[in-house]
Amino acid sequence: DVPKVTISGLPLVVIRFDDPDINYEKTLFDAIGTTVDKKSDATFGLVAVAPIGKNEGETRINSSKVKKYAERVLRSLVSFGLPSKKVALTAKTSGDVVVPEVHIYVQ
């Protein structure tokens, strides 16, 4: 049963992929670790946010890129020891972002 993402409040972590080689793992590890220490049954919502492009094709490319980034972040979370069943994944497009972003919410 795939958990659903509830987007409310501010994200715990925002990873901006303006550089595809961004080093986000330490920040992510610390944030997840602190959250799990406080609430051992915490679950997380991972939201891939793609910028709206100048046309439909560009928006599609942005969506495809950000989904790959989100999968990379999910693999990082699992490598930290977080069970994949504790992470729900979803995607959206937004006019509020200019580069692909991955937002992580505590559920």
Describe the function of each predicted region:
Residues 1-44, 95-99, 105-107:
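Periplasmic peptidoglycan-binding/tethering modules of Gram-negative envelope proteins
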Residues 10-14, 34-66, 89-93:
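Short, surface-exposed beta-strand segments enriched in small/polar/acidic residues
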Residues 15-17, 67-74:
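Short amphipathic alpha-helical surface patches that serve as generic macromolecular interface elements
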Residues 71, 75-107:
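Periplasmic OmpA/Pal-like peptidoglycan-binding modules at the C-termini of bacterial envelope proteins
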